[in-house]
């Protein structure tokens, strides 16, 4: 498992089976099963050392990743959706 995927799964308590690779992670955009953990600020495009922080990691389907990933016109929308997702989870996690 890649480092950024583990960071995301740990933060959001995603159930993961290391033997089968199965998980219950859902896309933050559609709620469909996620295949990719997307870097909102790409590692090679200014993300640098902060690229693998939870604020920069977002679960997406493969199709969503291809459509929205690494495209400047969608970055603000992805950040908005992701920040709302973090807030919702944090409220439930720390009640």
PLM-predicted stretches and their roles:
Residues 34-47:
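Short recognition patches in nucleic-acid-associated and regulatory proteins
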Residues 1-26, 47-51, 55, 77-80:
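Short, charged surface segments at domain edges that flank catalytic/cofactor-binding sites
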Residues 44-58, 66-95:
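Polybasic, low-complexity binding patches
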Residues 27-32, 64:
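Short Cys/His-rich metal-coordination motifs, predominantly Zn2+-binding knuckles/fingers
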Residues 26, 36, 60:
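The −1 position to Zn-ligating cysteines in a subset of zinc-ribbon hairpins
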Residues 33, 37, 68-71:
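Cys/His-rich zinc-coordinating "finger/knuckle" motifs
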Residues 39, 64-65:
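Histidine-centered divalent metal-coordination motifs
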